[in-house]
């Protein structure tokens, strides 16, 4: 659906596209500045109940969700899956996410804490 159900995070790229995480639709919806729906990134079973969206230094879309544990799913801006990470730490429900300059992810949680996750992406090994 091109309509927003429960928007809760937003980021804009340098191509005048607006990326909005939609908690109830389990995805990020992309619109242009005129409000025209362009595409969807993620979906149920991939990005369950997203709490936020960001763009990292590589221009990739990071979608944070906290269905079961904290999950971070990384996509190209076209919507191709790059990688998916799952926290091994069980913590309280998170309500917001932000990216730091070094690529770390900061979560604000229901238990009045901030959680900082650092991740390293390893390039694929060529044959």
Model regions and ranges:
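Eukaryotic scaffold repeat domains enriched in small/polar residues
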Residues: 1-127
């Amino acid at each position: 659906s091109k309509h927003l159900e429960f928007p809760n995070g937003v980021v804009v790229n340098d191509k005048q596209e607006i990326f909005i995480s939609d908690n109830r639709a389990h995805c990020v919806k992309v619109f242009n500045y005129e409000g025209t729906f362009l595409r969807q990134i993620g979906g149920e079973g991939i990005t369950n109940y997203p709490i936020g969206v960001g763009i990292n230094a590589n221009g990739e879309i990071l979608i944070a969700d906290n269905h079961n544990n904290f999950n971070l799913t990384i996509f190209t801006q076209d919507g191709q899956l790059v990688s998916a990470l799952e926290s091994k730490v069980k913590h309280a429900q998170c309500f917001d996410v932000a990216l730091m300059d070094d690529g770390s992810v900061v979560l604000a949680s229901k238990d009045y804490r901030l959680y900082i996750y650092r991740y390293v992406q390893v390039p694929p090994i060529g044959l």
